[in-house]
From Swiss-Prot:
HAMAP family: Undec_diphosphatase. It is found in: Cell membrane. The gene is uppP. Catalyzes the dephosphorylation of undecaprenyl diphosphate (UPP). Confers resistance to bacitracin. It catalyses: di-trans,octa-cis-undecaprenyl diphosphate + H2O = di-trans,octa-cis-undecaprenyl phosphate + phosphate + H(+). One of its GO terms (molecular function) is undecaprenyl-diphosphatase activity. This is Undecaprenyl-diphosphatase.
Length: 277
């Protein structure tokens, strides 16, 4: 049964990681309804995210290679620092700093109290409303060539908010991008690139802890988690292409209503003790 549950959670991770609806919240919610009725845990979540971030690397492979080459070239002087690809490399590094620092400072809280379903429900609703405002009032004039270092660090703090399940990594960064005047597609694209260092760092750290301790602190072992990670990669790759096409022509209204309704449903389920916090 654990294999089936892990496969289902891998599917959920792949479907939700790149949408502004919080994959960690969905893993937490779906896990409560499975036979184990348990939180998959922060380690399981972080490791399966390695699958979806690998999908980002494969999907944006040419862009990433170009950015990395230009960034290294800027270090040796072969490429000017203001080269767009070199700048993007620096912007990704800069934007990754907040989540790394805050993730280390609040690691214990992230793995325990912040995974409360009450917090998940609240964050789904609150940040759904903020996304609605950003989508409505954002000028949506800027593209990524206009991304400044100041905006890069603001993106980074928005990403760090996703350490709280229910906020959504992509939701937080996309919301910040819209509020700063970037187009929906530009905000989503930078969100995907920005997540790579943070997610790989967190996932590899949790994988190291898991291997060192010979097991996961949760209902699923390493083999089941590996299966979930592979499924998350395959499904996530498909979702990236679909999502970028979707946001190029449509608003985020669908995701806003989904977040709010899901959060309200969680309040009801928690209030009637159908699921535990």
């Amino acid at each position: 049964m654990n294999w089936i549950e892990a496969a289902l959670l891998g599917l959920v991770q792949g479907l939700t990681e790149f949408l502004p609806i919080s994959s960690s919240a969905h893993l937490r919610i779906v896990g409560s309804f499975l036979p184990n009725a348990a939180d998959p845990g922060a380690a399981f979540t972080a490791i399966t995210q390695l699958g979806t971030e690998t999908a980002v690397i494969v999907y944006f492979w040419r862009d990433i290679v170009r950015i990395v080459q230009a960034w290294f070239g800027s270090l040796t002087g072969k490429v000017e620092r203001n080269n767009p690809d070199a700048r993007m490399g620096w912007l990704v590094i800069l934007g990754s700093l907040p989540i790394i620092v805050l993730g280390l400072l609040f690691q214990d809280q992230i793995e325990s109290v912040l995974r409360s379903m009450w917090i998940v429900a609240t964050m789904l609703i609150v940040f759904g409303m903020i996304l609605a405002v950003a989508d409505a009032v954002g000028r949506q004039e800027r593209d990524l060539t206009q991304l400044s270092y100041k905006h890069g660090i603001l993106y980074g703090f928005a990403q760090a908010m996703a350490l709280i399940p229910g906020v959504s990594r992509s939701g937080g960064t996309i919301t910040a991008g819209l509020l700063m005047g970037y187009t929906r597609e530009a905000a989503a694209r930078y969100s995907f690139l920005l997540a790579i260092p943070a997610v790989f760092g967190s996932g590899l750290y949790q994988l190291y802890k898991t291997v060192s301790n010979e097991g996961l602190a949760g209902p699923y072992g390493l083999p089941e988690t590996a299966l979930a990670t592979v499924i998350a990669f395959v499904v996530g790759y498909v979702i990236i292409g679909w999502f970028l096409k979707f946001v190029s022509t449509r608003s985020y209204r669908l995701f806003v209503w989904y977040r709010i309704l899901l959060g309200l449903a969680l309040y009801v389920l928690l209030g009637f003790n159908v699921i535990s916090a």
